[in-house]
Amino acid sequence: MPAMRGLLAPQNTFLDTIATRFDGTHSNFVLGNAQVAGLFPVVYCSDGFCDLTGFSRAEVMQRGCACSFLYGPDTSELVRQQIRKALDEHKEFKAELILYRKSGLPFWCLLDVIPIKNEKGEVALFLVSHKDISETKNRGGPDNWKERGGGRRRYGRAGSKGFNANRRRSRAVLYHLSGHLQKQPKGKHKLNKGVFGEKPNLPEYKVAAIRKSPFILLHCGALRATWDGFILLATLYVAVTVPYSVCVSTAREPSAARGPPSVCDLAVEVLFILDIVLNFRTTFVSKSGQVVFAPKSICLHYVTTWFLLDVIAALPFDLLHAFKVNVYVGAHLLKTVRLLRLLRLLPRLDRYSQYSAVVLTLLMAVFALLAHWVACVWFYIGQQEIENSESELPEIGWLQELARRLETPYYLVSRSPDGGNSSGQSENCSSSGGGSEANGTGLELLGGPSLRSAYITSLYFALSSLTSVGFGNVSANTDTEKIFSICTMLIGALMHAVVFGNVTAIIQRMYARRFLYHSRTRDLRDYIRIHRIPKPLKQRMLEYFQATWAVNNGIDTTELLQSLPDELRADIAMHLHKEVLQLPLFEAASRGCLRALSLALRPAFCTPGEYLIHQGDALQALYFVCSGSMEVLKGGTVLAILGKGDLIGCELPQREQVVKANADVKGLTYCVLQCLQLAGLHESLALYPEFAPRFSRGLRGELSYNLGAGGVSAEVDTSSLSGDNTLMSTLEEKETDGEQGHTISPAPADEPSSPLLSPGCTSSSSAAKLLSPRRTAPRPRLGGRGRPSRAGVLKPEAGPSAHPRTLDGLQLPPMPWNVPPDLSPRVVDGIEDGCGSDQHKFSFRVGQSGPECSSSPSPGTESGLLTVPLVPSEARNTDTLDKLRQAVTELSEQVLQMREGLQSLRQAVQLILVPQGEGQCPRVSGEGPCPATASGLLQPLRVDTGASSYCLQPPAGSVLSGTWPHPRPGHPPPLMAPWPWGPPASQSSPWPRATALWTSTSDSEPPGSGDLCSEPSTPASPPPPEEGARTGTPAPVSQAEATSTGEPPPGSGGRALPWDPHSLEMVLIGCHGPGSVQWTQEEGTGV
């Protein structure tokens, strides 16, 4: 398995630090969120606190960290206020008070509130520790329970206040002195810290940076990699020179001293000594995959692993010889121990084994090194055969055979007294070291091949034996040589398979797991390179892959267990997930139920900074934290901190329900989790229904944090849409580009009906509500359901006639006060700014009076009324309620602006429509003078529809309360002001019964298309449509046409309607019929 780099991602180890540092007396603590002012909810609760108070973790979470649920009648009110003040001011506080367990038993508690800051220096958490000091208080007698809190007033006696206060003060002093005396054996330095007021360092709630000394080397850093390269070269040098110097040495006497060492030998020994020093300052990877930076742990780990081997390999034989210390050949053989350093190179070289060229190079180097060792041994065997031969001149060894072929035979000479020889052939291998004594006869063996020829011949034999069976030119003759040749051939067969057969099945089986790791790593790197993944995301991907590989070693357990039978697979799953199945939540489950649940459990892994669950995600599993710590966030606020043994998720929903997460869950450290899939959980509970109620009840108490609170989407209830008076709720969405989300569909051109009914039609109640600007509408109901249409509008299932449709949003531009008002009425509906033909506007047309329009059309798509989009099912959540409140507020502001604009418009019209005296009124054809004061009255009403303009035409002969003169002979009747202001049409038809027409001046509309009466029969002809449209002068209508409709004469009685000054609509006067309304004059205006 390749050496891992270790997990170097920065982690938030706050929870682990608290658990290890605050043990013993400080293990009973809770953590409160200091960012939620006023409540300071508990985000973590230790097991010791639960054991002390009797409350479970689920009962303590999200309560106030002041732990007011532990208060009782004897709890001091003053201490309560001081605790609250310390929390509000983010200050440290310590006090003694009486608290009560869940069972009701009181106990004395030493409470300590410690604020904890984050990386920004802000107080993020409160550490509230609780220490039970009841035993200390009980030593003073039973009256000590009554000295504080409510008992102080309950049992106090008059005149004893000073005595009780002194006694309490003395006991407090004794208690603190006893505490200091107990701490004295721990060391004087701690006492000095207490005297000078130095406080213990508290951990901060932040991502812990990698803190290491500058003298600590990272095992995978560039500096350490460079140093390892030098050590690799030195080790290879030792692997080559040590066997050669031991086997090819020509020293014959044990007392002979070695020659001076070379510079390379001295440099290698210095490097080995320095490597020992650096190994004491180099990080390592622990069994859990974490990188250890502590110097003490590093030293302990090195001493127990490679220290002894490195010390033996670094014995300075050459340095001792350099300092004139006599080192013999026997001691020099200990240098062969340095070859064991090659074992240390294997893990370091294994990280490069994923590259084929590197693997081939390393294998060839190993093969050549092995051949060098075999050659050295083969040379040593041949020389020993010559020295130990019984004859004076042995001739059966491979060295004698080589000497005869090279014509450099061996010969014997007598040893001289000074140890020299008379031949002087120092270049031969037998004479280079001074020769050797033959059989102890005083003769010395000299001659033979040179040392270079002998080594090359040995290396040739070694390679031929390792790669094949040899060629026979260099063969084994003696028994010793034959035995070594056999061993060499066996080693050669194995090495041949390893080196030259690495693509075969044997090599693949040997490196199957390694190849799988490298192939997946290579695929991952190729994917990153092809898709140009950014560097931070690339690092996260590699970290996650390496961390998960370290956990499961690349084994796909799901695929592996699929081939096993269900019975065996269930037993294996119960063994793997026994930590989760031993929770109290599953105590009542039968063995069969546990086996079914174990098959639904899946392992999961989360790295630091990774989000396990995002807010709004559909919850699909329950998660049990096996190791590590996580935090629950919502809008950057920490809601809970989860550690080992915590269960997160939601309450058991129905199968059809989808639960959305109400917060984010992020890993602080490397976390190993077990997730229970909700789908598998439902299937298991369906098989064992007797366990389902117990599991549902127990799950509420076991959840450390409920992620599904308020996140269940309810089913649709369409029965709420059946009422006639039910209005659909609308939601105004704010678009960033400023475009309207919904528009109003116009009425089709071939429809006889329109949103504004003709005078002959009877308005329905729903249409009247839509037409009145100040209608009183019921409060819209949330959660309306319907079928969505393609236009983004939900059609109610109860039918189109059941619900009137309104605008999606109403927006009014502000009206400036310093410019003349536009007296032409406009329909302000929030979409009037669009002037293209694709924008839908209101269509005001007067339909044909008659029985065919006696009833108003139902509000729907065909009638052209406004469409109300239905709110989707998620409108019941909190976000939708906030948006709806905002939309209602904005709509109210726009309605107020519209009311102010209408009042200004009404005042301006009242100033224009004042009573006029007798005067000449111009004809429609434009002949004759016209008073300037009448120009404003002659302007027709214009309604902007985006397509064509419409003008209002009064009937001929109608007068305005007798103020206008009667028509003279030969002249057309004068034009009257056709519009006063009256009550809204919500109490009656939209327009009184009159013969006025809405006629279009557009060229595209044929003449008379919008008229209800025939063409005028008087000699005076109206101006052409183009002139009328340009000048804005309405066409005249004859008296005959006015009376041909069968309308009663003006002045007939009618019912009066209530006046609404805030709701103004345009109506026609002067042509009252029997069924029309008799309008009353307003005092002071003549209208």
Curated annotation (Swiss-Prot):
- Where does this protein reside within or beyond the cell? Cell membrane
Q: Which residues are glycosylated?
A: N421, N428, N439
> Biased-composition ranges for Basic residues?
776-788
What's its membrane topology? Multi-pass membrane protein
Q: Which InterPro entries match?
A: cNMP-bd_dom, cNMP-bd_dom_sf, Ion_trans_dom, K_chnl_volt-dep_EAG/ELK/ERG, K_chnl_volt-dep_ELK, KCNH_animal-type, PAC, PAS
What is the catalytic activity of this protein?
K(+)(in) = K(+)(out)
- UniProt-listed CDD domains: CAP_ED, PAS
What cellular-component terms does GO give this entry?
monoatomic ion channel complex; plasma membrane
Q: Highest taxon of the source?
A: Eukaryota
Q: Where are its TM segments located?
A: 229-249, 260-280, 303-323, 332-352, 362-382, 483-503
> What range(s) does the PAS domain occupy?
18-90
Keyword vocabulary terms for this entry: Cell membrane, Glycoprotein, Ion channel, Ion transport, Membrane, Potassium, Potassium channel, Potassium transport, Transmembrane, Transmembrane helix, Transport, Voltage-gated channel
Q: Which GO terms describe its molecular function?
A: inward rectifier potassium channel activity; voltage-gated potassium channel activity
Q: Where is the composition biased (Basic and acidic residues)?
A: 137-150
A Pfam cross-reference name:
cNMP_binding
| Post-translational events | N-glycosylated. N-glycosylation mediates traffick to the cell membrane but is not necessary for voltage-gated potassium channel activity.
Report the SUPFAM superfamilies cross-referenced here.
cAMP-binding domain-like (SSF51206), PYP-like sensor domain (PAS domain) (SSF55785), Voltage-gated potassium channels (SSF81324)
Subunit details? The potassium channel is probably composed of a homo- or heterotetrameric complex of pore-forming alpha subunits that can associate with modulating beta subunits. Interacts with KCNE1 and KCNE3; these interactions regulate KCNH3 trafficking to the plasma membrane and its subsequent voltage-gated potassium channel activity.
Sum up the protein's function in the record's words: Pore-forming (alpha) subunit of a voltage-gated inwardly rectifying potassium channel. Charactherized by a fast rate of activation during depolarization followed by a rapid inactivation at much more depolarized value causing inward rectification due to a C-type inactivation mechanism. Exhibits a rapid recovery from inactivation.
Q: Which PANTHER family match?
A: POTASSIUM VOLTAGE-GATED CHANNEL SUBFAMILY H MEMBER 3 (PTHR10217:SF481), VOLTAGE AND LIGAND GATED POTASSIUM CHANNEL (PTHR10217)
Protein name per its UniProtKB record: Voltage-gated inwardly rectifying potassium channel KCNH3
From the broadest rank down, the organism's phylogenetic lineage runs: Eukaryota, Metazoa, Chordata, Craniata, Vertebrata
